Amino acid sequence: MQKIVQIKDLIHKFVDTDAEGNVTGEKNAVDSVSLDVEKGEFIAILGHNGSGKSTLAKHINAILMPTSGTLYVNGKDTADGRNIWDIRQSAGMVFQNPDNQIIETVVEEDVGFGPENLGVETEEIWKRVESALGKVGMLEFRKHSPSRLSGGQKQRVAIAGVLAMHPDCIVLDEPTAMLDPHGRQEVIQTLKELNEKEKVTIILITHHMNEAALADKIFVMNEGKIALQGTPKEVFSHYDEMKKIGLDVPVSTEIAHGLKKYGWHMPDDIISEEELLDSIKKNLPEKAEKDTEHRVEQKNESKAEQDNREAQQQKDSGEVILSLRDVNYIYSADTVYPQACVKKCQSGYLERRIYRSNRTYRFG
């Protein structure tokens, strides 16, 4: 396959200076990193804070230049200033905070901002805007103000702005770090669809293990170096090494490892809930079969039937402390607040409701 990114012995050195400009120390934020990314791949780069992953990401878009070593994007050297324009069109970049990337007051105008600066004809700009917003599921919000969108929606608009530039790959530097779980799910699902349906190369910088588990290949960074690399199964099977450098593993991997300590026969490369359940079923065939039948019955229930069954179970047990339904958080001041209340709150005597005071929810 064609290599879209080629990194060879890349070093990026940060220099510390005192108030007078004298050098007081040096540190290799990226230290002799070599890796290749093939066209159409979904790559995840993992690492704790200070591992060098974000510094590496900024080299791919030529925001930073190597101290030594080489980095080529579509065969063009990022260290050659004559290539910067082409490289930044080939490798789009999305950052943590979508508010730092959105500059226009209307969604569609923001998405069209990049192509407009390239001198693209107006008719072509609007075609790109419509296509990009459609690919990220935000076409119905094209006339909205970004300030009225959720964090996940804003990040999808930021991704659409990059797509409108027609890049060959998108580098995303922890794009879900500031989002709630629902927003994270929206963004990651968008990235998967872009990769699988549109064949866009994705390079995802993240510290969320479940996000990395969706990638084709993972590179784990520690102290500026590549500590581990391979498929998600290969990387997360190195449980002890991951823990040693201060990183977690997917929840299913963690559970499987814990069960293994108690003598269960669990594979080292479990990374998904389905794999975990299959392995548990093999260890406890009779119990697992009954549980599977029960899950199938629950899956076939309607939403209303599930709600009624769960409510009755909660009422009978008396163990539920708090259960929320239809709770909303609205970002803009001029939007009507839906009623938000606690449906059930049981612990023998405790029963409360949520009341709204201006823009603050409080228990009363």
Residues covered by each model-derived region:
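Helix-to-loop junction immediately C-terminal to a conserved catalytic motif
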Residues: 61
